[in-house]
Amino acid sequence: MEFVGATSPVGHLLQCATATCRVARKASAAAALVVVDTTGLVHGSIGRALKSAKIELLQPWMVIALQREGELEALLAPYRHRSEPAVERLEVAAAVVSKTTEQRRARRQRRFAHYFRGARTLELGWRSLTLEGSAFLSGRAMPGHFCAYAEGKLGCEVARVERTGNGLLALARGEPDRTVQRAAHQEGYEVEWLSRFDNLLVGLIDRKGETAGLGIVQKADLEKQRFLVATPLESTEQIACLRLGSMKVLRDGTELGEA
């Protein structure tokens, strides 16, 4: 399993490309032939960038293009005069029907609900944890008077201030606010919003850098300096990092939107 942060490649092209490469490399160690079924994102510059990155990273000996009316030709053009990879064009079977947006959403909800059906809420202490996708927890927590000073500068309630390699990071309460963001930029602060973590879908990364499982953040507990995370994993003892996603979801699979 590889967690890239969301169910759509849009906004996560680098993560999707690297994760695909990692999974294919592992599969190659145990199989004579590996077939990579890529996503349906094929249109526009984003689709071309993602597919080109996967081809360059995977270096396949053959690319099989399933298309209806030549919609993949723009993706295939760079390989027209190259000796590798070979390109085989196939027509999509007439019986194949594209799923609607609602059908895709309903399927995701069922899959999430099934995955988290037996989830328990486990504790992840901040002292032994890092975050991927945020500067929070990367620095040194500053004394309380730094919070009061930051509140005066930013105009919001600040729960924690850290000194990171890039300056000061303020953990703010409430919802994201553009006025606060502008003030932070002017005053040299980086702002992370505590509300970001509510129901956030995360990847639980073990000490070897592998995705051990998924979780949903139930609470960022400032008093006890810990995250409470719903996950089907038996234990979080080997978890070293939370890879923060960009979507929020409930245990029953209901998607709450982007973080």
Indicate residue ranges for each PLM-predicted region.
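Preference for solvent-exposed, low-hydrophobicity sequence contexts
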Residues: W61-A259
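Phosphate/Mg2+-binding loops and adjacent switch elements
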Residues: V23-E88
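Nucleotide-state-sensitive switch-loop elements of NTP-binding domains
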Residues: M1-V34, V42
